[in-house]
């Protein structure tokens, strides 16, 4: 696995600089995403009268976990937005902190991962905004983020996603993406997406940004999501509390690199990866369709640092579906009040989308496995919110009938409090290597990666994962040079 290629293409770079001038585009640095205090005051002033989802280049500066929880006019805050799951809900004594992606543009943190993939090629000129189309293969949210960033950066985009994804995804994409391609199947049908990208690759104007293989994805999550989770923990921890673990379900596995950063800062913690029980690829070399939208794609992503992963946790998709209804129906919210939750806490539970709920369930199983106490904290992220799944709640109501307080109590007990430590595995060295070796069949046999790079991921951490994570500084230098050539910062 080589580092991100930052070779300059002078012709493409000149075209991109001119495009940026014409469209008033200033590109934020990774450092500014980590610490919004570094953002110029004139840009912040413009944000005070810009909506969170507005198609305005200034919203590139809202690719941050530190946004205020406002639909319009929001600036930044020291502590990232998060949902804490009380013990009365989780059934475990430890603290579970889930950092919210709802307050990114598009309502999902994938706008960050897609930036991490596009920005290096844009500021080097490898991607020419006047010639190339940005192709975003995805199981839903990544192509939304990629299409949004493409629009802000004045690039043409092609979104590819499975036809069975939620209606809300397609409705929104129709307003943003230049072209939408729906591939056969559901969440776990990524092979069909890859096949479509190979077809599109025959056209030299189509540039593929494959989140499962692009090292810009883990670079962004390590340097932005990882730092934000550390900020969150440090800002809300109580005396004597320790960070015991982080749990992330794997779609592209980009967020697992946030865990790499956390393990460096908190050496005693453990990092767990989650997947759907109906598609147990990591746990059991398994396969199958499932309903946890955004994760679990019947392969091991190229960008997953498996060697640094301590545990795999499988979540039944029925649990996340039932809890989505509990948290988003009036009857379920009334039930949550009986557990002592405030109106503010209940509102925050709507910040959890389906994969976010699965992440929280991973944290609960993790806590039960390690018998965590009040002194322990487990962190995760909420990729998106329930906004993307209102149609799914309606489908559940049609499937199971009208909701009630009794059904809510039953769902809570069966699908959260009743979680066991089954279908999970603390990974030994040989077991991690077994998972890592699965990459061969997708990436070497099918997608053109080399055995040498595959082995380097396992045996040479310093020149692979560590080297990619460290490229943020070099990328920022290129972004600053690009902005200087565009000249808009000086004119602020």
Language-model regions, residue ranges each:
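PLP-dependent amino-acid enzyme catalytic core
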Residues: 1-492
């Amino acid at each position: 696995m080589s580092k991100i290629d930052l070779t300059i293409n002078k012709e493409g770079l000149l075209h991109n600089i001119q495009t940026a001038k014409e469209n008033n585009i200033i590109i934020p640095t990774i450092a500014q995403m980590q610490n919004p205090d570094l953002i110029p005051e004139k840009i912040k002033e413009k944000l005070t009268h810009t909506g969170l989802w507005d198609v305005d280049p200034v919203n590139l500066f809202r690719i941050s976990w530190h946004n205020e929880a406002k639909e319009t006019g929001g600036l930044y805050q020291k502590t990232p937005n998060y949902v804490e799951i009380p013990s009365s809900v989780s059934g475990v004594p430890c603290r579970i902190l889930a950092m919210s992606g709802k307050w990114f543009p598009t309502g999902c943190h994938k706008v960050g991962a897609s930036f991490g993939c596009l920005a290096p090629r844009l500021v080097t000129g490898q991607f020419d905004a006047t010639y190339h189309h940005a192709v975003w293969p995805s199981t839903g949210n990544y192509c939304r983020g990629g299409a949004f960033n493409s629009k802000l950066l004045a690039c043409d985009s092609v979104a590819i996603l499975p036809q069975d994804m939620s209606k809300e995804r397609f409705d929104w994409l129709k307003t943003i993406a230049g072209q939408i391609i729906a591939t056969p199947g559901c969440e776990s049908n990524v092979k069909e997406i890859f096949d479509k990208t190979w077809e599109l690759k025959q056209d030299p104007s189509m540039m593929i940004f494959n989140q499962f293989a692009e090292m810009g994805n883990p670079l962004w999550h390590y340097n932005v999501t990882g730092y934000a989770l550390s900020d969150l923990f440090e800002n809300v921890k109580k005396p004597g509390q320790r960070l015991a673990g982080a749990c992330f379900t794997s779609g592209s596995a980009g967020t697992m690199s946030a865990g790499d950063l956390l393990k460096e800062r908190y050496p005693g913690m453990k990092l767990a990866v989650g997947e759907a029980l109906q598609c147990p690829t990591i746990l059991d070399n398994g396969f199958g369709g499932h309903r946890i939208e955004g994760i679990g794609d019947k392969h091991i992503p190229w960008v997953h640092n498996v060697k640094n992963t301590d545990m795999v946790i499988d979540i039944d998709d029925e649990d996340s579906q039932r809890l989505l209804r509990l948290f988003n129906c009036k009857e379920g919210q009334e039930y949550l009040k009986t557990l002592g939750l405030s109106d503010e806490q209940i509102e925050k539970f709507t910040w959890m989308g389906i994969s976010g709920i699965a992440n929280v369930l991973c944290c609960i199983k993790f806590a039960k496995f390690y018998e965590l106490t009040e002194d322990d904290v487990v962190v995760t992220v909420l990729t998106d919110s329930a906004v993307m799944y209102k149609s799914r709640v309606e489908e559940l109501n049609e499937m199971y009938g009208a909701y009630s307080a009794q059904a809510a109590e039953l769902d809570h007990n069966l699908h959260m409090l009743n979680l066991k430590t089954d279908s999970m595995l603390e990974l030994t060295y040989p077991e991690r290597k077994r998972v890592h070796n699965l990459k061969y069949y997708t990436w070497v046999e099918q997608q053109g990666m080399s055995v040498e790079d595959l082995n380097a991921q396992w045996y040479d951490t310093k020149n692979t994962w560590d080297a990619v994570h460290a490229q943020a500084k070099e990328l920022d230098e290129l972004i600053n040079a690009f902005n200087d050539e565009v000249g808009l910062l000086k004119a602020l």
